[in-house]
Amino acid sequence: MPFRVEVLNETSGGARLTPERATELCRRAFVERGLDPERMGELSVALVEPEVIHDLNLKFRNKDAPTDVLSFEVDGPYGEMVGEIVICPGCAEMDLEELVVHGALHLSGMDHGENFEASEMARVQKRVMEAVRGR
């Protein structure tokens, strides 16, 4: 099964992300991390409202506040499902494409701790964004 990303937009706003662009962004993030996306299967990106991501953040991270992006690994046979990235465009400080890459990097095993700007993850994210934007 070739790597692909499904996009589910549950927002009332004008957030736009095509499955093709989401696939390109995630593929580039995984390749940057030395992973072979073609062996990974499927990933989903859900665009949600602030109250939805707030509930998820409370349930899974015990944080009683909305956030911009959450990533969830999905256990399953290798090559079927990688996980889900949940993004709240209304809570975002980064742009939508950066949040997709950010979520994919979390799924690849990266973390940034409390200081994102000083992290290796921030440097990798910047390289990926420069590559996909042709800079």
Curated annotation (Swiss-Prot):
It is found in: Cytoplasm. InterPro entries: MetalPrtase_cat_dom_sf_prd, YbeY, YbeY_CS. Its main location: cytoplasm. Single strand-specific metallo-endoribonuclease involved in late-stage 70S ribosome quality control and in maturation of the 3' terminus of the 16S rRNA. Its EC number is 3.1.-.-. It is an enzyme of class 3 (hydrolase). The gene is ybeY. Binds 1 zinc ion. GO terms for molecular function: metalloendopeptidase activity; RNA endonuclease activity; zinc ion binding. Belongs to the endoribonuclease YbeY family. Its cofactor is Zn(2+). Signal peptide: none annotated. Transmembrane segments: none annotated. The keyword rRNA processing applies. Zn(2+) binds at residues 102, 106, 112. Pfam families: YbeY. This is Endoribonuclease YbeY. The lineage of its organism: Bacteria, Bacillati, Actinomycetota, Rubrobacteria, Rubrobacterales. Keywords: Cytoplasm, Endonuclease, Hydrolase, Metal-binding, Nuclease, Ribosome biogenesis, rRNA processing, Zinc. GO terms for biological process: rRNA processing.
